[in-house]
Amino acid sequence: VDSKFATNRTVYFCYSKAANDKTGGSGNSTALASARLSDDGKTLEDVNVLFSQQPKYRSALHFGCRIVENPDGTLFLGLGDRSHRMQDAQTLHNHHGKIVRIRKDGSVPPDNPYVKTQGALPEIWSIGHRNIQGAVRGNNGGLWIHEHGPQGGDEINRIEPGKNYGWPVITYGEQYG
């Protein structure tokens, strides 16, 4: 829920968004939306999609989707690598295996670390993540995440802007199989 929920009744949620078949695309992505909870608490109103992970990919795995409101009012969103696209976590031209930071209207803050990096998606905050399962803001305002690793490779990390957290190049787990 939004930090000002008592007055604005805004909630944030993620869902699996299908590709628009009219464009010939396929697959799905993690999408982040905001909505206002009705006064009777029974419906969501004014639903607005703030973000949709790119590229879409046909998979039912590693969506991520942990939302944390930053003290400055921006939103952090943890995104999984979609399992079969693990190498994407090391690049800046897609959202797989990333944490992104956006404003509550979906726009990109100008102080994000990759805003001025050619070829990078400007909403990216950090890279090299597998599948973020938990996220919380610490007492000092920092972002902490729990990442589901392969066979014994779970991690807890304090997230910093522009940092690479290693997946899949560095892991303490073992591949399945």
Q: Model-predicted segments: where are they?
A:
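Acidic, Gly/Ser/Thr-rich repeat motifs that build Ca2+-stabilized beta-propeller blades
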Residues: V1-M86, G134-R137, G141-G149
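Beta-propeller domain segments
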Residues: K4-A6, D72-F76, D81-G177
